[in-house]
Amino acid sequence: MNYFISFVINYLTIMLSEEKLSGLIITYNEEKNIAEVLECFDFCDEIIIVDSFSTDKTLEIARTCPKVKVIQHPFHNFTEQRNIALEHAKNDWVLFLDGDERITPELKTEIIETLHSQHSKDAYYFYRKFFFERRAIYFSGTQNDKNFRLFRKSKAKYVADKKVHETLDIKENIGVLKNKLLHYSVSDIESYRKKMIHYG
């Protein structure tokens, strides 16, 4: 069975199941990314965007998708924005993505199968494959990078005292998905320089 047929079957399964999924993202001036992120969320029951008053076309593009619900909130820190998204999600299962992250068809299928497994955990780590200028990065120390992206919001919350690289507070029943999330972390040299200055 090829991936397309498998995905269609799994997609129909999730639509008929009680297990629904909310796709969550926080944004500020993500017009270059938002359309692709929304495509990654196409199997979600709803999409929650917490936006920090973008000045570009982020929201104009986002509102073309009928599943999208936009909440505008001033940016204080990443932890607060993510927890606001959790508060507005109507489903227990949530999938968080950043603007520079993408889901492969294989990962999407694995997520759907995980939601319907009788042995599903409460939270799942995603390993990430990093890209620089759309080219995959190897041997850079990023091979073991992983983050929580799929979890039950009833079992977890972002720790409030973490301002950057926020931490999900969950104690046990944790799993890891085998397919990697694509992370287009740096688009060019100038973006890399600005990122290092900002987080340095």
Language model region names:
Residues 18, 89-92:
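Active-site acidic short loop of glycosyltransferases
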Residues 20-22:
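Cell-envelope/extracellular polymer assembly enzymes that use nucleotide-activated donors
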Residues 25-43:
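Short, well-formed alpha-helical segments that are part of the catalytic scaffolds
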Residues 32-36, 56-64, 106-107:
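Acidic helix N-cap motif at the loop->helix transition within catalytic regions
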Residues 40, 51-60, 98:
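A conserved acidic beta->alpha catalytic loop
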Residues 52, 73-75, 91, 98-101, ...:
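Short acidic donor-binding/metal-coordinating loop in glycosyltransferase active sites
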Residues 59-88:
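Conserved donor nucleotide-binding strand/loop of the catalytic core
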Residues 80-86, 93, 104-200:
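Catalytic-site signature of metal-activated, phosphate-bearing donor transferases
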